[in-house]
Every structure is written in structure tokens, then in C-alpha cells.
């Protein structure tokens, strides 16, 4: 079995990949995550997933490398990871009662081959009060998450609905697509 590397140090992605019961290592990719002028949220997610995988694959040319990225999209505007309580509050306020699209891309780069997939998840947030937003952020600061919430935790209480073909995509790694790509690359799953 060839070496498998996850180009991420995200605990969320590491936990998801662990579900496939494959041996893998993690390596932090060194990639500039800034959007390019005019780049759509889906194009940004796709480009970053490829760049993360390709950057690590250049260091480990005999390995298969998984790169993934997620970009939240509110009315065509990409929402980054908030980083601060204030920005998280502003994001949740803007998303209150709205449908937010999450573009989650995965790229598998290996010896002489690249495979890619893109998942779209739509999240309908319920109308949130200022008090609910503050209470949520105090209980579960999601400053490192696109959209300022953790759907695998208390953040699910902020939603009215989720529309997706892959429930794991919203956590940050579309496992249905990734399992398909890994099988195409010759990995035996299960």
C-alpha cells in the first residue's frame, strides 16, 4: 500500500479520514490562502485543495497526498475563518435567516496522477437573536471554522436545514467523494 498523507493539521479532517481505517500521516501545507481577484468561492476552494496537496506531494513524490479546503459563500461573497470573536459575531449576524453555501473541495495527488472532487452543501440558518449568537460563541468559539460554527457540535442548533449529498463535507472533508477518489487511485476501501 502506498504512503498516504493528509495535507492538513486540522483535527476535524484528521478524525474524518481516520474513519476509513487507512494508515496516514499529516503534514502542514504551506499555502497562501488569499483569494485572487474575481475568484469565485468554489474556484477558491478547488484551487486551495489542489495547492495544498501539490505542495506536500512535491516533498513526498512517492506518496498519495490529500488536500482539502472549504469556503463559505453568502450571496456570492466568500467568508473566511473569522479568527476573532467580533468577526464571528458579524458573520453569524449576516448569516442569520440566510442560506449559506459551503464549497468543500478535495484533491488527491499521487505519482503522475491528480484526482479532484467538489461538494456543495447548503445550510439554512434560522433567524438568530443577538443573545443567541453571543451565547453560542461563548459556549463554542468556532474561530477556526468557515462560517463561524461547528456543525458537529452545538452549532447544529443554529440551523433550520442542511442540503447535501455528503454530510461529512460540512465538517471539512467530503468523505464520500474522497473514498471514491482513493478507490480510483487503487486503495482498497473497505
UniProtKB/Swiss-Prot annotation:
Q: Which Gene3D superfamilies match?
A: 3.90.950.10
For molecular function, the Gene Ontology terms on record are:
nucleoside triphosphate diphosphatase activity
User: Subcellular localization, per the record?
Assistant: Cytoplasm
* Residue stretches spanning the membrane: none
Which reaction is the catalytic activity of this chain? N(7)-methyl-GTP + H2O = N(7)-methyl-GMP + diphosphate + H(+)
As cofactor, the record names: a divalent metal cation
Q: What is its main location?
A: cytoplasm
Site (Important for substrate specificity): residue numbering on this chain? 12, 70, 152
List cellular component terms (GO).
cytoplasm
Q: Where is the active site?
A: 69 (proton acceptor)
GO process annotations (BP):
nucleotide metabolic process
The alphabetized UniProt keywords are: Cytoplasm, Hydrolase, Nucleotide metabolism
What Enzyme Commission number does this protein have?
3.6.1.-
User: What is known about what this protein does?
Assistant: Nucleoside triphosphate pyrophosphatase that hydrolyzes 7-methyl-GTP (m(7)GTP). May have a dual role in cell division arrest and in preventing the incorporation of modified nucleotides into cellular nucleic acids.
User: What protein family is recorded?
Assistant: Belongs to the Maf family. YceF subfamily.
Q: What is this protein called?
A: 7-methyl-GTP pyrophosphatase
Native source organism of the sequence: Xanthomonas axonopodis pv. citri (strain 306)
Amino acid at each position: 500500500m502506498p504512503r498516504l498523507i493528509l495535507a492538513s493539521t486540522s483535527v476535524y479532517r484528521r478524525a474524518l479520514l481516520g474513519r476509513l481505517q487507512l494508515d496516514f500521516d499529516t503534514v502542514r501545507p504551506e499555502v497562501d490562502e488569499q483569494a485572487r481577484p474575481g475568484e469565485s468561492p468554489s474556484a477558491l476552494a478547488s484551487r486551495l485543495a489542489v495547492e495544498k496537496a501539490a505542495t506536500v506531494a512535491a516533498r513526498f513524490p512517492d506518496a498519495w497526498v490529500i488536500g482539502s479546503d472549504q469556503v463559505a459563500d453568502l450571496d456570492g461573497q466568500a467568508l473566511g475563518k473569522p479568527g476573532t470573536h467580533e468577526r464571528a459575531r458579524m458573520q453569524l449576524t449576516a448569516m442569520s435567516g440566510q442560506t449559506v453555501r459551503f464549497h468543500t473541495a478535495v484533491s488527491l495527488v499521487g505519482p503522475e496522477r491528480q484526482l479532484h472532487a467538489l461538494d456543495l452543501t447548503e445550510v439554512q440558518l434560522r433567524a438568530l437573536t443577538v443573545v443567541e449568537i453571543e451565547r453560542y460563541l461563548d459556549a463554542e468559539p468556532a474561530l477556526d471554522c468557515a462560517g463561524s460554527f461547528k456543525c458537529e457540535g452545538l452549532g447544529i442548533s443554529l440551523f433550520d436545514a442542511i442540503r447535501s449529498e455528503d454530510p461529512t463535507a460540512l465538517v471539512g472533508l467530503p468523505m464520500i467523494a474522497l473514498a471514491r477518489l482513493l478507490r480510483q487511485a487503487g486503495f482498497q476501501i473497505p
